[in-house]
Amino acid sequence: MRVILIGKNGQLGRSVQNIVDKKKQNNNFTFVGRDELDLTNDNNIDKYFNHNHFDLIINCAAYTNVDRAEEETALADQINHLAVSKLSKVANKKKAKLIHISTDYVFDGKSVKPYLEIDKTNPFNTYGKTK
């Protein structure tokens, strides 16, 4: 199985890469960052996946500056929302699986119980809305 992890330079991407490296199973993994795959450019996404085949796409990339997302709404939306939609279409076209990591910011924080994946979202800021 060929696996690509997008977002290798972020906190989550580095953590996943460290786990894969420790298990010595990285021979089927490709780790890419912004330099290799710019998620702000749909044509770049298409071009990359037209030249590379993967069975599994793990998206750890994200615009994570919560406060700055209020000012850079378009960029946050492009990376956290529109690029994910594009990756989903690419995965479907290539018959690959897609794992996308979200955030608890999609919830408003008012629940007294831990949130479940099936709970209704209610983001309270731009960052949460883009995720």
Spans of features found by a protein language model:
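Adenosine-cofactor binding site in Rossmann-like domains, unifying the SAM/SAH pocket
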Residues: 25-47
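Active-site Tyr-X1-5-Lys
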Residues: 122-131
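NAD(P)-cofactor binding segment of oxidoreductase domains
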Residues: 71-99
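SDR active-site strand-loop-helix element
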Residues: 6, 32, 57-61, 98-103
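NAD(P)H-binding glycine-rich loop region in Rossmannoid oxidoreductase-like domains
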Residues: 42-79
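Active-site segment of SDR-like NAD(P)-dependent oxidoreductases
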Residues: 64, 104-107, 121
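Conserved catalytic-site region of short-chain dehydrogenase/reductase
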Residues: 101-114, 126-127
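N-terminal Rossmann NAD(P)H-binding glycine-rich loop of SDR-like oxidoreductase domains
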Residues: 2-22
